[in-house]
Amino acid sequence: MQEGKISQIIGPVVDVDFPEGRLPSILDALTVKREDGSKLVLETQQHLGEERVRTVAMESTDGLVRGMGVVNTGAAIQVPVGAEVLGRMLNVVGDPIDGRGPVNSKKTYSIHRSAPKFEDISTKAEMFETGIKVIDLLEPYSRGGKTGLFGGAGVGKTVLIMELINNIAKQQSGFSVFAGVGERTREGNDLWHEMMESGVIDKTALVFGQMNEPPGARQRVALTGLSIAEYFRDEENRDVLLFVDNIFRFTQAGSEVSALLGRMPSAVGYQPTLATEMGQLQDRIVSTKKGSVTSVQAIYVPADDLTDPAPATAFTHLDATTVLSRSIAELGIYPAVDPLDSTSRILDPNVVGDDHYNTAQAVKQLLQRYKDLQDIIAILGMDELSDEDKLVVSRARKVQRFLSQPFFVAEAFTGLAGKYVKLEDTIKGFKEIIAGKHDKLPENAFYLVGTIEEAIEKAKTL
């Protein structure tokens, strides 16, 4: 064991002196024993000359003093993996934080691993159903693909990701890993209790490094969750679901650490290594010929600006994007997905079939035409439109409302029972609205319902 001594502490960044020629390697984990007997983990980030390393702490550095002994573990941070982590809640270094005793796993993985080789990566395209109409119809998610949920503050990213966990984890028998990166502790607590109640906790591993943690933990916790998912993919050949909330906080933590490590900031004050860090994380989230990792990542958009370097860098790695819009949330339509801004690589007749593809395109054309007419309506009013355009507006408003849906995880707030809508019911409903079968029904009949049959029933009560 190589012993070093702390020489300087600047917030979450700690400098450690080692004897000459015994410097730890970059990314090696070092441990410091605190006075209360607990261990603090540091990760080596830079070599400063022959005898000093600069490290980032994975927990608060309160109580550390110069001269304290530091032990080099000789390896990167190792976290427990395997069946033993299911149903447990861990922190960035793999210690349990659920108060249910130690995790007795037989195997550990390093949080830093190389991405699979190109020849091992699977390229097949196949859709998986989420039960959420707007997603299944307009930006279908691919099995083994990467999906991003983009949105500003308070438009419903976390609620949507919770609903996806609820729908997918219940419908599919696979394992899920949830990484809470720099988000609200309250939401993590709610998720834990909801999973306990719904019974999906036994198939889920939860890893948290929330807002109150130092940047080192927030920067690395996504990698911890990913290593757990990789074990199930590579060693047990399973299809795994990986949920990350929020990938922006990963970038934000990197930017906090970057300045303290003495790097020059790049565009908008982000770290110069932004694209590399994002690439190293995203390149590991892939499906191989053995098993798949299907990932859903919430991505916060600072000030609703999609061109900000953090969300813009994430865009390039994704197969499908679900963009949440404040203007749609203001209309009271939830999930507040922007149907014209959201995209999917597999919305292709060869993958989803002609019926699905044609219906989706017809819905988009109708909504785009309505968007184009909105300026005319705002200036001249509805009366100036031709009869054909009035019909477009009426159907588009029905489609817009039919894209909303009550969520299981929001039952306590809406008072409405959640709905899971099968893909064929979704396609059938939108086809009928576009064909004009329901022109006589009031708009409100389509708001916050599941299938088209429910809309017809609701119309009878209005």
Swiss-Prot record:
SMART domains, per the entry: AAA
GO function term, MF aspect, one: ATP binding
EC code: 7.1.2.2
Membrane topology: Peripheral membrane protein
Positions of transmembrane segments: none
Similarity annotation: Belongs to the ATPase alpha/beta chains family.
Role of this protein: Produces ATP from ADP in the presence of a proton gradient across the membrane. The catalytic sites are hosted primarily by the beta subunits.
Subunit structure: F-type ATPases have 2 components, CF(1) - the catalytic core - and CF(0) - the membrane proton channel. CF(1) has five subunits: alpha(3), beta(3), gamma(1), delta(1), epsilon(1). CF(0) has four main subunits: a(1), b(1), b'(1) and c(9-12).
Name of the protein in question: ATP synthase subunit beta
Annotated organism of origin: Chlorobium chlorochromatii (strain CaD3)
